[in-house]
């Protein structure tokens, strides 16, 4: 309980910073889990600290801000005006918009960001999307709608991103695994741009 009170106090004082730290940490935990549960020893020998750093950077500097904004949009803009905010019809509407708009666009965005941070070309990002988008989206639809229905029904707006991030430790483990899977299968080389002095 004390941790929750500390989190709430921090969220009130510095909401963006608190969300960034929590989201980055939980994305990092997801990647650590993925590397320990699904090692890619054929490509990389040992633990890949840079891969975890990329997950933390994506979570803290990119997803935390997008996720926070997205949940505010869903809460403040996506609802039936003639129904109370927490009416079941608004929950269904928010889950539908989340799963039919955010999820299909968020996955290619994630794979593209990861490819860029890995120093790879857009062709690699396209390959990841081609290979992983549809199966990952199907898994997303098997996992997230029920949780989001609960999230939109009972979790206060300021805690929705945290609720998603805690459950997303398992999802981020899966995403990190899927992101690395194409690289392991195809052994796509890293293409760094030339250094200009």
UniProtKB/Swiss-Prot annotation:
GO terms for biological process: ethanol metabolic process. Its main location: mitochondrion. Belongs to the peroxisomal membrane protein PXMP2/4 family. It comes from Saccharomyces cerevisiae (strain ATCC 204508 / S288c). This is Protein SYM1. Keywords: Membrane, Mitochondrion, Mitochondrion inner membrane, Transmembrane, Transmembrane helix. May be involved in cellular response to stress. Required to maintain mitochondrial DNA (mtDNA) integrity and stability. Required for ethanol metabolism and tolerance during heat shock. InterPro entries: Mpv17_PMP22.
